Amino acid sequence: MNHFNSGRRAALSALLATPFLSLKVQAQGSDWPNRPVRVVVPWPPGGGADTTARMIFPKLAQKLGQPFVIENRPGASGSIGAAEVARSAPDGYTLLHDATPLAINPFLLRVSFDALVDLKAVFLPMQVPMLLVMNPAQAPKSLAEVIALAKARPGSLDWASSGNGSAQHLALELFTRAAGITVNHVPYRGGGPALTDVVAGQVGYFFSNSNVSLPFVQGGRVRAVAHTGRGRIAAFPDLPAIGDTLQGYEAYEWNCILAPARTPTAIIEKLNTALNEVVQDPEVAARYTQLAMVVRPNSVAEADSFLRSETEKWGRVIREANIKLE
């Protein structure tokens, strides 16, 4: 009898506590942030993710009235800093500003966390399409001609990437499968050396980060025939998308802002709303266009769906191509 009464009292206490828990979560969202927020960028200073973070978070600080302090925590292709955030308290005061390898690393490295379980995608601040570039001495003048040449000479076109398992390598593997071609993959140690050798004529073709290669295209040092994004892009409005020819093809380098998985929904939604406003700021939008970055308004659900689809897509490509790090 005592056990029965104890059980009833526990159940009644839990029931009575539920509204107060709900009110507590709401309160967490309403007064957040009331102190500085730490933003972990798991990449070196001056890189793409760091550049984007330093465009966005000062504006976010102005909007929300608290500092957003960027800490660079590079290592293991972003995994060290990401794991640190995944283990952090889910209170909205530690965020992660990460990049494309977040969706690639689980299939190539030993990582100590699951981004789809231990982290919550909040917002996609940018996507950067890649440009299919080549040395101007190469014969093709269009995407169709590149594909036709590759089909006529299977395995003979030298195609650079910024390294095994890089976003550029995966974009290439996705492209060759969609086009039904084979090429000779030439991995470099970074995109800079790869683009340098395309300019010098040492290697023929490359999927290059658009904000890096666009000045070379504009200066006539490389030829671009297509981009890996969707539709027309403001920074290069006359360049067609590969997806216009190969239906469904799409590949980006991107950044994603995330929080520990159990961060209150009210905080996540407040952050998403504020970030959507920040990227529409005229100064930020102009800088995005200058850097050939694409930003589209996105909800928490859309950011989450994107991260999941990227993880599934690149995992499939890595398995099919049997990609391994040397």
Language-model regions: role of each:
Residues 87-92, 108-193, 242, 254-287:
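Hinge/capping helix and adjacent helix->loop/strand transition within the periplasmic-binding protein
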Residues 27-117, 156, 181-204, 297, ...:
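N-terminal (or domain-start) structured segment
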Residues 97-102, 126, 161, 191, ...:
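Beta->alpha turn/N-cap motifs
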Residues 26-38, 89-93, 147-157, 218-221, ...:
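Immediate post-signal peptide segment of exported/extracytoplasmic ligand-binding proteins
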Residues 4, 10-27:
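N-terminal export signals
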Residues 46, 100, 135-140, 161-166, ...:
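Short coil/turn segments
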